[in-house]
């Protein structure tokens, strides 16, 4: 598959397919024409010696400092070097790759004044999978993601560190190996590379893809738990959910009915008990609400993926061109969205932990042994797996605190309100990793519980999942190091995202 970029129509599904299929990027001709026209405006500004922020002036507090024309290019290189103050662990390879795609896509809108050489350099890095090593910490989320994007830009000019073919190398060495010249930044181009929200948005895209997948994965795991506890299927009837009108709640209920169809372990209302606890009965309401959040997040991300979030922006109308200093780099819309994503994913973990507690608690699990222990007393069984899940969901509650309500002034109070969107993105991804492990714990415990109940009673669809995951996690016949089982399941769940489509 080839991913065609035009600056206007990029979707998360495009990104997901690109990552799954190891695709190449191509640029449509109309987008290249827009790039040429916006660059021509920059050249006229330089020729006419106009005063325009970031082209003929300094940056931030130095916006009133006029730069000597002989130093315009040096100004851009200095910008990249001085702003590359990222710290901490690097973003994942996937996030860094998506970051480049998103920055390229915004340049193709034709409002940034980039040269074709810059556009082609980004395309080359993407297609050759030269992945800049970009530290995660250091962005305030306005003026965009300055520090992370500066590390991306360093790689393009041959000064940064990159991953290429599995090895960490100097960018300059990789370019030399591939007979490619480092990019020679022209006027405005440093600013065009780093003024934007691509770090938070790229991490947000990856987080959305994985969060949506966790939502689907959580349903079949919940279906195993439901059967292990002889759950009541009546609560998933379509008419119950249709009268509330929340479409994602209706969708989850339909998928739960599908997962449970043909099971002899489920029960009907008043057959064993009149109603189940909320963690079983309200799966459509709880999980559906998370999917509603995911839909909102997807919409916001896709707006930003196709937005011009540079500063200043170049506009060309009939018989008129103009350059405007604005604030489209401010990450507040994405910060809000990613804070919401944290809540949606955290609740998948919260309800999963409560379900798995019902599987191991002898006061709640019916006729199952305490902690599913093969020999209660001598062997502890799943006792501490629940502790681990409780620890992760409690950590999520701290991480879910909204980053977007924080702000701090910078650049001598010129930049006096910031979004902290990249912090929201980073914390959100940690919540996703934690939640994946909580679901892995529920999976390990539910596999054992269904085995004790009798797998022959499982629905056909959940029986296939049981067999698939039993090849990863063997039966619990004695106490062992269960962290290996948990991590194996979590890793398997994660790997499947970029190999196949999400489980529906």
From Swiss-Prot:
2,3-didehydroalanine (Ser), modified sites? 143
Which molecular function terms from Gene Ontology are attached?
Answer: histidine ammonia-lyase activity
Q: What is its EC number?
A: 4.3.1.3
Q: Name one GO cellular component term.
A: cytoplasm
Q: Which UniProt keywords apply?
A: Cytoplasm, Histidine metabolism, Lyase
Query: What processing steps or modifications follow its translation?
Result: Contains an active site 4-methylidene-imidazol-5-one (MIO), which is formed autocatalytically by cyclization and dehydration of residues Ala-Ser-Gly.
The record's annotation in InterPro entries points to:
Aromatic_Lyase, Fumarase/histidase_N, HutH, L-Aspartase-like, Phe/His_NH3-lyase_AS
Q: Can you supply a Gene Ontology BP term from the record?
A: L-histidine catabolic process to glutamate and formate
Q: Where is this cross-link: 5-imidazolinone (Ala-Gly)?
A: 142-144
Which pathway does the database say it acts in?
Amino-acid degradation; L-histidine degradation into L-glutamate; N-formimidoyl-L-glutamate from L-histidine: step 1/3
Pfam families xrefs: Lyase_aromatic
The protein's annotated catalytic reaction(s) are: L-histidine = trans-urocanate + NH4(+)
The SS bond pairs are none
Q: Where in the cell is it found?
A: Cytoplasm
Instruction: Identify the main location.
Output: cytoplasm
Q: Which family does it belong to?
A: Belongs to the PAL/histidase family.
* Protein's name in the database: Histidine ammonia-lyase
Tell me which species this is from.
Staphylococcus aureus (strain bovine RF122 / ET3-1)
Q: What gene does this protein come from?
A: hutH
């Amino acid at each position: 598959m080839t991913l065609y970029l035009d600056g206007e129509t990029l979707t998360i599904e495009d990104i997901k397919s690109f990552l799954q299929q190891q695709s190449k990027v191509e640029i449509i001709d109309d987008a290249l024409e827009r790039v040429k026209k916006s660059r021509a405006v920059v050249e006229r500004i330089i020729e006419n010696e106009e005063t325009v922020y970031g082209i003929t002036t300094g940056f931030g507090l130095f916006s009133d400092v006029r730069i000597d024309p002989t130093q315009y290019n040096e100004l851009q290189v200095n910008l990249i070097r001085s702003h590359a103050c990222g710290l901490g662990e690097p973003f994942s390879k996937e996030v860094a790759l998506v970051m480049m795609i998103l920055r390229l896509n915004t340049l193709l809108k034709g409002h940034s004044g980039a040269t074709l050489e810059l556009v082609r350099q980004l395309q080359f890095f993407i297609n050759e999978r030269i992945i800049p090593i970009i530290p995660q910490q250091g962005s305030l989320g306005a003026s965009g993601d300055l520090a992370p994007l500066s590390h991306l830009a360093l790689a393009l000019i041959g000064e940064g560190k990159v991953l290429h073919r599995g090895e960490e190398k100097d960018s300059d060495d990789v370019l030399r190996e591939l007979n490619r010249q480092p990019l020679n930044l022209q006027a405005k181009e440093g600013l065009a590379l780093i003024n934007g929200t691509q770090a938070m948005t790229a991490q947000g895209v990856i987080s959305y893809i994985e969060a949506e997948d966790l939502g689907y994965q959580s349903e079949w795991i919940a279906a195993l738990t439901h059967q292990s506890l002889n759950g009541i299927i009546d609560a998933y009837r379509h008419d119950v959910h249709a009268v509330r009108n929340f479409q994602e709640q209706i969708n989850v209920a339909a998928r739960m009915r599908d997962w449970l169809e043909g099971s002899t372990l489920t029960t009907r209302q008043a057959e064993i008990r009149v109603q189940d606890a909320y963690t079983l009965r309200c799966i459509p309401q709880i999980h559906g609400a998370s999917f509603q959040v995911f839909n909102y997040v997807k919409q916001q991300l896709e707006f930003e993926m196709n937005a011009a979030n540079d500063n200043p922006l170049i506009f060309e109308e009939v018989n008129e061109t103009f350059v405007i200093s604005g604030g489209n780099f401010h990450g507040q819309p994405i910060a809000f969205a990613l804070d919401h994503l944290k809540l949606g994913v955290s609740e998948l973990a919260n309800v999963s932990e409560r379900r798995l507690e019902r599987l191991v608690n002898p006061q709640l699990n019916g006729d199952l042994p305490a902690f599913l222990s093969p020999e209660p007393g001598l062997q502890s069984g799943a006792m501490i797996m629940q502790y681990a899940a409780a620890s992760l969901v409690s950590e999520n509650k701290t991480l879910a605190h909204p980053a977007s309500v924080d702000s701090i002034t910078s650049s001598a109070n010129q930049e006096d309100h910031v979004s902290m969107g990249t912090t929201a993105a980073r914390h959100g991804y940690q919540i996703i990793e934690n939640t994946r492990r909580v679901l892995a714990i529920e999976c390990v415990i539910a596999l054992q519980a269904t085995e004790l109940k009798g797998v022959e009673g499982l629905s056909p669809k959940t029986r296939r999942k049981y067999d698939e995951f039993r090849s990863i996690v063997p039966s619990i016949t004695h106490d062992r190091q269960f962290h290996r089982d948990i991590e194996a399941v979590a890793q398997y769940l994660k790997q499947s995202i970029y190999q196949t489509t999400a489980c529906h």
